[in-house]
Amino acid sequence: IAQSLNRRFGTSFHAGNILMTVGAASGLNVILKTLLNPGEQVITFAPYFVEYGSYVRNYDGELVVVSPNTVDFQPNLVEFEEKINEKTKAIIINTPNNPTGVIYSEETLQKIAAILEKKQKEFGTSIVLLSDEPYRELAYGGVEVPFVTKYYHNAVVGYSYSKSLSVPGERIGYVVIPDEVDDSAALIGAATIANRVIGCVNAPSLVQKVIKYCIEHEVTVDLETYEKNRNLIYGALTEYGFTCAKPDGAFYLFVKSPVENEKEFCEVAKKHHVLVVPGSSFACPGYVRLAYCVSYEQIERSLPAFKKIAEEYGLCK
């Protein structure tokens, strides 16, 4: 894994920087268990994966949420800087993002890094940037996903093969703790112990062998299938009058609800046998998330229902 990352991103990782985990969820819990003291804070950007709050509370921490920037769903950096204080221990970012599919730009990561460097000096603390990257390989149209350790020395990466290999049930991933991270040797040692004490013990050894094979033979999901699905559903929904940002990655579409209460819209959609998740589940009310990680034919069959819903709300004639 270290060699593969070095080839792809020009890094200089070694085996000691990699800790195999039981998926990305386990990896995040391992790092938070390692970092957090009771009452310390972790900041994340809305919209965000709802389980982050539970992960932080597992270790008596507090999740602080930055309001969404609904213009382009890049992070709201003005509010972000305001929310950092002496209790801030870590920042969680997720790019490509669930639920928007947006990829944080290189400029965004550079600005986040500059803010964190400034705040570390201001408070005399160490703030870890924890990048949750289960969708890293799912980027479309030649868009690159910037690798966060290039921009900030105190960055830790969590990865899962659930999406890149379509094996979510196998629970296999890793965390990268670079040598450049503050007290990296202590952090790596503590994370190794945390992997055991939270009950994961170690990542499944048989699946680790499968991962080695997949890396050596460049096995991954068929991106063309996802991109084809994205183009179909995005094109149809925008044609019907819905508003949504075209995702550069992942396999979600984050759609603006035609009514203020998006849960009401979810119930209407359900009557047409369309299931969508309310944006309030991601701390971004007024939107809904749908997933296009299904067959192309299933999306085609759903389009008449989406059109009827649009007609009900007067979005199209």
Predicted features by range, described:
Residues 6-317:
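PLP-dependent class I/II
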Residues 2:
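Class I S-adenosyl-L-methionine
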